[in-house]
Amino acid sequence: CPNSLKKDFIEFVNIVLEKELSAYRFVDEQLTDITDEQEIESIETAINSSNKFSGTNIHLKAALSFLTDRNKPDYRNSVKESISAVEALCVTLSGDPKATLGASLNSIEKSHSLHPAFKKALTSLYGYTSDSDGIRHALLDESTISYSDAKYMLVSCSAFINYVIGKISEN
């Protein structure tokens, strides 16, 4: 499909898929079984609005790709890429490429009025990826990360990215 028609084609196909009660939709040009409109919108908005944050954008697209790979889905790496997208955005916004996520969140909390509860929630989510099944570190055993885990992380991280980008655009 030519690029000029791609967006219209995807919208048309998604309308047909929804009308026929299909369990699939296109999200960022990838066929996936994410069908909830809010989840799709959150992921697509994060991908589209993170274009100016290339590291974030690359990680989000990789997370979606790992999640939707029909031949060999890689849920562990989808989770890793989802949280890495958040980390990349926060580090970029902090202005310190060597900053940790915690230091970056402190900077964002001060400069963009990030609520302490949001900061704590994200820190906890990041901790989950550091501790559980070695998601971000060397695997010791076979991963127990499921599709639901990976989808949750992609949608949640996309929502957080949308929130932070929205907060910085308000200032």
Locate the predicted segments by residue.
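Long, charged low-complexity segments
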Residues: 101-171
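Long, hydrophobic, amphipathic alpha-helical segments used as structural scaffolds
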Residues: 17-20, 24-28, 71, 93-97, ...
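Long, positively charged binding patches that form subdomain-scale interaction surfaces
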Residues: 31-119
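Non-catalytic, well-ordered alpha-helical scaffold segments
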Residues: 7, 61, 76, 80-83, ...
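A general marker of short, structured functional hotspots
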Residues: 5-8, 20-22, 71, 122-124, ...
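Internal, Lys/Arg-enriched amphipathic helical interaction segments that engage polyanionic partners
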Residues: 1-55
